[in-house]
Amino acid sequence: LTAPEAEKYMQPKNPCVVTGLPVRGELINADREFSRAELGVDERPVILSMGGSLGARVINNAVTQLIEERYERKDCYFLHATGKAGVGMFDVIEKEKNINLAENKHIMLREYINDMHRRMAAADLVICRAGASSLSELQALGKASILVPSPNVSENHQFHNAMALVNKGAA
């Protein structure tokens, strides 16, 4: 099993073994300082947010609001992956919210992040869905997180995934 909480849903003939979920070696070996330098950030906190490759409207909208409320302070960096469905967020930020992304280097929007292991290493806070792989990566890196479980998954499993971390004080 990946988490001890899953055992109550099993009907094993033999005892269950909690092994966790393996994570990529490149994630474990990603260097925080190198990753931050590569990203071009100083000591200010980095908030990494994402809703998956397709995007998540609720996360994109919340991050848009967060950026609008905080961008003038320039006290942190925002690195957000909009996903395929969220590419319109660029126009919302620039045209509707009147925030010039070229002038605000502390706001970094991408459709997709190809080198997530380095971006996670650079981050101080991660806002994301509560899929099993994402949670394993957050735990492996010891990252502070705000989890937004998807309501569109079978048996509400992302909620249960998130609660396993919340109950341990890890999210």
Feature map (PLM): residue ranges:
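Short, structured coil segments at secondary-structure junctions
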Residues: 11-14, 74, 103, 141-142, ...
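A donor-sugar binding/catalytic signature common to diverse glycosyltransferases
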Residues: 116-157
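Short, glycine/polar-rich helix-capping loops at beta-to-alpha or helix-loop-helix junctions
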Residues: 3-12, 134, 155-162
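Donor-nucleotide binding loops and adjacent catalytic segments primarily
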Residues: 32-34, 40-125, 159-163, 167
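Active-site-proximal region of nucleotide-activated glycan assembly enzymes
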Residues: 1-32
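Short, acidic/turn-prone active-site loops that include or flank metal/cofactor-
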Residues: 4-6, 22-24, 112, 132, ...
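Short loop/helix-cap segments at secondary-structure boundaries that form the rim of catalytic
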Residues: 6-16, 90-91, 119, 138
